[in-house]
Curated annotation (Swiss-Prot):
InterPro entries: C1-like_sf, PE/DAG-bd, SH3-like_dom_sf, SH3_domain, STAC1/2/3. Residues 1-26, 178-215 are annotated as: Disordered. It is found in: Cytoplasm; Cell membrane, Sarcolemma; Cell membrane, Sarcolemma, T-tubule. Residues 217-276, 277-334 form the SH3 domain. The keyword Chloroplast does not apply. The gene is stac3. It comes from Danio rerio (Zebrafish). This is SH3 and cysteine-rich domain-containing protein 3. Residues 7-17, 191-210 have a biased composition (Basic and acidic residues).
Length: 334
């Protein structure tokens, strides 16, 4: 085996005996070797671009904050944390009523104040949702689309409500004048007793319509369920148990009613219709009912309408939204 290995070693060629010359080597006749390298080109560094001038943010409508004592727990419109300190002092905007901590004042210095907000649509315009306006100065002068939509909707609703009530009132006045003009004519024709067949049919139809109108007007009335304090000048102020005459029910939410000599608008959910023969009761003490037994829970001074006879000391009553049994000894008839 050793002989075969020696023969193989003689025939083999080692790369280290005659290594290949690299490409960048130049060899002359006197065995002088030169290495050739590419010339390095130094790249000139471009001067850095000039730094842009910082955008100076100007707030044309800043908040007007003043020290405010919070009698009730309030939440900061910036950090959404409760304003609870020993003295409960906070900063409150004079116009938009925004409440913030003293430490959060720097976060709203570039926010615009939206001014006074109509009652019923007060929103936190200085909440963190509006912090994006600080990063985008081009959109600082944009108004809130939700607020504009609500404001236009309220204005249009008030116009339609007043316009509909005026049209309804004019139509009722015209109908009353026509009925008054037709009534003496019918009396004279009835006294003479000389009417044709067509006139008799017409008179009978008119009398029937009048009887139906009288029956409809006397078939029900409306009773106040809750206390409603007038918000606007044309609203009707009433207390629970007041009897209300409805003049206009064309609107789905606000009706026009009358109590004595006072007229105005009222929310239709605050009243209940009472039909002829139904009795109205007032709750004298709060009671928690059992739903499994068909009982309802009512609070003191609530107004209910009787809907059934007494069974085992319980009356079936209705509040307009709920219907069930209630102890008869806790009800006082109005």
């Amino acid at each position: 085996m050793a002989q075969y290995d020696q023969l193989e070693d003689k025939d083999s060629l080692d790369i280290h005996d005659n290594p290949p010359a690299p490409e960048n080597v130049v060899k002359e006749d006197d065995n002088t070797v030169y290495f050739v390298y590419d010339e390095e080109v130094e790249e000139e560094e471009a001067p850095p671009p000039p730094t842009p001038e910082p955008i100076v943010q100007v707030n044309d409508k800043p908040h007007k904050f003043k020290d405010h004592y919070c009698k009730k727990p309030k939440f900061c419109d910036v950090c959404a944390r409760m304003i609870v300190l020993n003295n409960k002092f906070a900063l409150r905007c004079k116009n938009c009523k925004t409440n913030i901590h003293h430490s959060c004042q720097s976060y709203v210095q570039f926010q615009r104040c939206f001014g006074k907000i109509p009652p019923g649509f007060r929103r936190a315009y200085s909440s963190p949702l509006y912090d994006q306006e600080i990063n985008n100065p081009g959109q600082q002068n944009r108004t809130d689309p939700v607020f504009d939509t609500l404001r236009v909707g309220v204005i249009m609703a008030n116009k339609e409500r007043k316009k509909g009530s005026e049209d309804k009132k004019n139509m009722m006045m015209m109908m009353m004048e026509e009925e008054e003009a037709q009534q003496p004519k019918e009396d004279e024709e009835g006294a003479e007793g000389k009417q044709d067949g067509d006139k008799k049919d017409k008179t009978a139809t008119d009398d029937k319509n009048k009887k139906q109108q009288q029956t409809f007007s006397q078939s029900h009335y409306y009773m106040a369920l809750y206390r409603f304090k007038a918000i606007e000048k044309d609203d009707l102020d009433f207390h629970p148990g007041d009897r209300i005459t409805v003049l206009d029910d064309s609107n789905e939410e606000w009706w026009r009613g009358k109590i004595g000599e006072k007229t105005g608008y009222l929310p239709m959910t605050y009243i209940i219709r009472v039909r002829a023969g139904e009795r109205v009761y007032k709750v004298t003490r709060s009671f928690v009912g059992n739903r499994e037994m068909g009982q309802i829970t009512l609070k003191k001074d609530q107004i209910v309408v009787k809907k059934g006879e007494e069974v085992n000391g319980y009356l079936k009553v209705s509040t307009g939204r709920k219907l069930g049994f209630f102890p008869a000894d806790l009800l006082h008839e109005l």
